[in-house]
């Protein structure tokens, strides 16, 4: 009986162990299957959430980027304005400039879109700039340049740069077209009456700044103080408009004029090349 009992007990234990192993295996399979399904579900949800978050992030980034570009553009424009104003003030500070505006010398509006030339003249007299301006006004001819540069380097401005002054007069026939200054409509003197038949074109005034230098042709070279002042004045004009205008002398526009004088010819070539009176 003991042997049978032991055999039965051992058999029962074996069956129980097998059953337990089967149960455990089945339970483990169910567990792992559940875990696997849960993992896929979580990954899917996480991916969806990630995609949604990524899209939200991209939207935020795109929005921020757009705003940032607008801000930067506005800031750069402000910087450009401030830099230009600073350059104008810096250039102007180097001048011994007296502003003595005379309304009678203004002949219309001249915005930056119409600025093309800086025309250099000689006064053909020894009077200082203030006397020259007063003489122009007294003559009643309403002729004037924007600036007059004294031999000591001081400067008088009698016409604002954004206004037309009558300093160049009539040019050679065809020069309006040759110089690209055809539109005379802004000038209160249209230039339809030629002088002697040779000078039918009057457009240069509408597209230029006129600078007179106190000088008499044949009297010798221009003083260094005057030339240095002219250098600085041209720099100021360039800064005011934000670009460089072509530099010519009066006789380039109208042949037969004496200005600028022969002693200025080397300086003129240097101005055209370097915008300074020296090479």
Regions found by a protein language model. Name each.
Residues 45-88, 199-210, 214-279:
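Basic/polar, cationic surfaces and motifs that engage anionic cell-wall
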Residues 1-2, 7:
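N-terminal targeting leaders characterized by basic, low-complexity, disordered sequences
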Residues 1, 13-15:
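Low-complexity, intrinsically disordered or signal/transmembrane-proximal segments
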Residues 33-38:
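Hydrophobic membrane-insertion alpha-helices, especially the h-region
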Residues 88-110, 117-241:
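Active-site-adjacent loop/helix surface patches within enzyme catalytic domains
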Residues 8-12:
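N-terminal, positively charged topogenic segments adjacent to a membrane insertion site
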Residues 20-32:
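Bacterial N-terminal signal peptides that target proteins for export
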